[in-house]
């Protein structure tokens, strides 16, 4: 073995070996199962640090359960990522001078599949470097043939239960991507903008009402003013009419409980391009008219400003209204504005025909399950509350997207008739042009990836899956949808437990991103430090629901631990191996391994990986390296030490798979993944070894404190206890000491009194130091006495200063007397 840990030597082709030997091909289940369906990364790019963290957690848990004797399944997959992939492909085509509109739909889809294949090869290469134990015989793609059958079947089953409908409703519209998006794909951000205070004159009156709005560009779609029915200031105006400032038409004043009396003047203009406004219009049977088109420009409803960008038009409209006396004032405010998560464009609210999932019944089913004993267990628990609150206020889900790349909606139209089925009903029937939201397809992955609705073999063995590991940021996007989809189709929960981890941030707490330039490429880290180092740096800093502040120091710490394990293994491997029974030290070490294993088993159940990391670090650096290896240096035989090393490698394997696999193969000629988690004896007579260590520590501390050379034999004895000759021999060898009955210098430790014969060299040094101290004290006393006999000082100095000098003189004399007596 090399003198230093070489991760490239250790990790080269090791995952390839695991795959060839089929260590992680899920067997026909005969033992207790442990299964995880891995969150599918998008085929839009490379894996980032967050993907690596997630994959490492899953892989470590699967390896742990395999060593515990479980039948394991870690199923890999990738997501077609509808909008994101289509944008990437369009950008790629644009570089070649090709527009999407230049291609037929089928041609564009082929381009998307070609893109997917290239990206998937890159992702698989990255998985290989990470060392993830996927069962690639069962890998899935959210747009493969089986997935298309499953998604269509799911859609039809929802339709048959009247849980899917097509309706013209206010939806979130991405003007850049030209598609509808769901509510949770809208991110609210604080934006500085202008608040316009508009004058609405009462019919046939010089009196006016002031209405505050940040969206002056929607004024032409105003159909009413609304006040809260509890607002006594305006209640007498309900039913009256006001003059529209722009069109000069009359619009009515209504009362609605959704109006906030605290916002602006407490009067709200009811117009298109707001979901709340649309709801009020429907409730009061008011006609709605859009004034903004699909591209974010003003339409024919505003002839004077038609074609103007919605935001540019704000100033134009404000100037016109000010000129005509309908603008009271303008203020600058900061308010939340909805942005598309996909394009970062400000979302527009438009009324459009779309496909929706009715969420009331599905939400009630999920909340009911959360109230049952069979509910999914969330780690940390507070995310269950978050999920419950979200479902209590949920809206219907917009599932149609105006894209080409994705699952086609299984609906066929002919004239005014339509049919919901997978295959075409016949000639003249045209399939709906839209595709389904990506989360609609990934929302059934918990059971569809296992074969539903065509093959139930894996479902019988591994469903519900044991665990889902994912980031808390997609709790509502993905976890929630798998939950209600599984309850609807499978009549049971999709997984037993959900472990939600946080985000990876830089060392000052900022989210890692391209725009900030603080992102780290996991493949570059692996190239420099190795996969085990990255795994350890991420996993051993993980706690459920918590973010990680990542920095290079964490990698250095992890690499040092790997190097320490390497050095321990090399030392033990070089020892003689003739048979020998375990001695007291071996049994003590075995008990330390027992404690480590117990701590890992205890904390892995709670997913407290940071605690596991601390336990492993303390064990390797403390018990194994500083203690056990030091203790066995008193002998040349490593027979039992090798047995203990083998057990440690198996215990550490889930967290350091490459290194432990290499060492097991190199030293023991065994495959670590063919082993079982070792049974370890608990040794109860540990105190004898702890006593030896206590004596060694204190003798070493004494030697270090007084800088006594190792060439000088330290003579000592234990006053209040007896040690065997074998135990004394160990102490002597590890402290360069010798037992000698004496009572010259007694050191009291936690449990003992150690008498040390002070070496002559130290006595001479000590005497020299004391003589110097005496000379110093005498000179200080002389100085103090001169000051205190100085008349000028005594007459001019403050009383406090004189008293201070006298006190100082007394202490100096006491100290001098002590040294002279000594």
UniProtKB/Swiss-Prot annotation:
Enzyme's top EC category: ligase
Catalytic activity, EC: 6.1.1.9
Motif 'HIGH' region: positions: 41-51
Binding-site residues, ATP: 514
Subcellular location, record wording: Cytoplasm
Entry keyword Lyase: no
InterPro entries associated with the record: aa-tRNA-synth_I_CS (IPR001412), aa-tRNA-synth_Ia (IPR002300), Anticodon_Ia_Val (IPR033705), M/V/L/I-tRNA-synth_anticd-bd (IPR013155), Rossmann-like_a/b/a_fold (IPR014729), tRNA-bd_arm (IPR010978), tRNAsynth_Ia_anticodon-bd (IPR009080), Val-tRNA_synth_C_sf (IPR037118)
PROSITE patterns recorded: AA_TRNA_LIGASE_I (PS00178)
Motif stretch ('KMSKS' region): 511-515
The entry's keywords: Aminoacyl-tRNA synthetase, ATP-binding, Coiled coil, Cytoplasm, Ligase, Nucleotide-binding, Protein biosynthesis
Any single GO BP term: valyl-tRNA aminoacylation
Protein name, as recorded: Valine--tRNA ligase
Gene: valS
